[in-house]
Amino acid sequence: MTRNHNARFAGVRGRMLIAAAAVLAPLAMASPAMAEHHPTGNFAPFKYCPLSNKATEICTVANTNAGEFTVGKKTVPITKTITLQGGLHENEKTEELEFIAAEGAETLSKTEETVPGGLLGIKAPKSWPLILQELFNEYVINKGLTGVTEITELAKPASAIKLNTTNLIFESGTALQLPVKVKLNNAFLGNECYVGSSSHPIILNLTTGTTSPPEPNKPIKGSAGKLEILEAGNLVRLTGGALVDNSFADEEGANGCGGFLFSWAVDPLVNEILGVPSKAGTNTAILKGNLEEAVAEAVKASE
């Protein structure tokens, strides 16, 4: 390891610790490779960190396990874990953190969620008994012919993800910039039905602070969560946090729905059902969960 690399390595860890210590002081006074790694103990969550990439200085894992994603007329509750993972490298010229794709797993997990109401937006009347509502929604709508699931996918290479740990901890500015597209799954819609695309992604500028969206949306507040510093300062853990953004737009709407032959007819139908394209101030992302970052050399040493 060169002297310059050591200096950058120390600088990245130093910035993490300075930011974390500043928060703790008042209390006291975002393509898979074949490589496999087996970190242990507190470092076990980083098994897909790109440790084979010499540029990796920090390992990061963020798990979203609650929240919601609203685009146009549709709100999809987050009920399953969505994982964003990979590595970070500090650009010595810009001092910005560059994201490196995970090894052995997706950088952004392709987690399938149910779209309430399915393709037609139908739900059981609220006047029905709760158990009857649940049975109707689950088995007649969600698992019927009109049932739709969605997967939020990364729309650009992992290097397009921007993570600012300092902003995240101090609840100010953009903590995570994430370019995504939403895949809709239904037999009628085909295999390539998306809202947003790689050429026109939905850009989420997520913050743990307070948003300032255009009307009709109102400001909402995120949270960094509870901060812990472990393993002699080599591991930073944030739990119970919330990343939010309600200023983003979907500029493209649906594309590829119904397959190559029928997308010209099906895309407008999906746009009408979902209310897309949708302008800034009409969409919302709330991602609740945990984030962990660790010094890559410490992760390696735990194997």
Features from the language model and the residues they span:
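Secretory targeting and sorting signals
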Residues: 1-35
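Extracytosolic secretory-pathway proteins
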Residues: 36-303
